[in-house]
């Protein structure tokens, strides 16, 4: 049933994500390449990557693993958002407490909406798996259609809230810049290592999220290759065995043919031995008969000639 869940989920996500790829780019035109934005992109990139695997690897995937990977990516995204927010709070400097509280509240609300969107998406996938498990082989077209519609709505809502959070953080950052004009140089020196660290963390997280699945795909490929080689060796051994059997049959047939030929020659010799004396005896009798007939004819001819002479 887990294999069925993976097979149904992956094609569905393929269609949803393929339709929404351009839409995601259009909804975040002003991306500043912040770590939290990269983490959010990895959340969707992971789903896109799953659908590129072969059917055999998709059958190997367990729904619990997909959920765990999504959970890790969600936590990474929210962690980066909190880290970026904390970084901006440290830069606010002498800003009015009322302004600080208002900005913090707006960012917190946008952050909560984004987290709720990702949590809702993960829960919806789990609910879909449970519904598939209870259908016991029945048609899942209606269920897939409903989930597809829900995922499209969730994608739009997620990108809308991400865009809203991006704008709130931009305002937050603007307030920080206004409140810390005298410390611009120091802030830039601090932001440089943080940005580089975020990029490095992004690269590590990106490769770390996909590496377990790549390892499983490679292991499965090795098993399939080994199985094919084993089947090929068995087929070759069987072919050699059949060839040997055919050679034995051919040898036996040639041997039997030779025996039949010898038996026929012996039988022919026997027949010749039986009939030759009869033929020779018949030839002798025929020759004697012909001699007797010729002698009788000659005697009759002489007798016929003698009688007329006596009458004269």
From Swiss-Prot:
The modification Methionine sulfoxide is found at residue 135. Sequence repeats lie at residues 72-93, 94-115, 116-137, 138-159, 160-181, 182-203, 204-225, 226-247. Keywords: Chylomicron, Endosome, Extracellular matrix, Glycoprotein, HDL, Heparin-binding, Lipid transport, Lipid-binding, Oxidation, Phosphoprotein, Repeat, Secreted, Signal, Transport, VLDL. One of its GO terms (biological process) is melanosome organization. Residues 270-282 are annotated as: Specificity for association with VLDL. Residues 1-18 form the signal peptide. APOE exists as multiple glycosylated and sialylated glycoforms within cells and in plasma. The extent of glycosylation and sialylation are tissue and context specific. Glycated in plasma VLDL. Residues 258-312 are annotated as: Homooligomerization. SUPFAM superfamilies: Apolipoprotein A-I. Homotetramer. May interact with ABCA1; functionally associated with ABCA1 in the biogenesis of HDLs. May interact with APP/A4 amyloid-beta peptide; the interaction is extremely stable in vitro but its physiological significance is unclear. May interact with MAPT. May interact with MAP2. In the cerebrospinal fluid, interacts with secreted SORL1. Interacts with PMEL; this allows the loading of PMEL luminal fragment on ILVs to induce fibril nucleation. This is Apolipoprotein E. It comes from Rattus rattus (Black rat).
């Amino acid at each position: 049933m887990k294999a069925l869940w993976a097979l149904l989920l992956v094609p569905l996500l393929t269609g949803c994500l393929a339709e929404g790829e351009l839409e995601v780019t259009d909804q975040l035109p002003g991306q500043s390449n912040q770590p939290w934005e990269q983490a959010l992109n990895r959340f969707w990139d992971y789903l896109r990557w799953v659908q590129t695997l072969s059917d055999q690897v998709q059958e190997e995937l367990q729904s619990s693993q997909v959920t765990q990977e999504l959970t890790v990516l969600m936590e990474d995204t929210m962690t980066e958002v909190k880290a970026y927010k904390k970084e901006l709070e440290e830069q606010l400097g002498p800003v009015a407490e009322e302004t600080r509280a208002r900005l913090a509240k707006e960012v917190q609300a946008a952050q909560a909406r984004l987290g709720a969107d990702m949590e809702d998406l993960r829960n919806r996938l789990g609910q879909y798996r449970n519904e598939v498990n209870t259908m016991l082989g029945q048609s899942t077209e209606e269920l897939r259609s409903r989930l597809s519609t829900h995922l499209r709505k969730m994608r739009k809502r997620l990108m809308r809230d991400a865009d809203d959070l991006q704008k709130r953080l931009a305002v937050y950052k603007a307030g920080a810049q206004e409140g810390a004009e005298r410390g611009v140089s120091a802030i830039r020196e601090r932001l440089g290592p943080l940005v580089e660290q975020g990029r490095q963390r992004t690269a590590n997280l990106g490769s770390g999220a996909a590496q377990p699945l790549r390892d499983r795909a490679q292991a499965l490929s090795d098993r399939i290759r080994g199985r094919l080689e084993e089947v090929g060796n068995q087929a070759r051994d069987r072919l050699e065995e059949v060839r040997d059997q055919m050679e034995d049959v051919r040898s036996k047939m040639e041997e039997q043919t030779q025996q039949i030929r010898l038996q026929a020659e012996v039988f022919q010799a026997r027949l010749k031995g039986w009939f030759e004396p009869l033929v020779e005896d018949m030839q002798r009798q025929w020759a004697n008969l012909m001699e007797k007939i010729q002698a009788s004819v000659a005697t009759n001819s002489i007798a016929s000639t003698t009688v007329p002479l006596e009458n004269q």
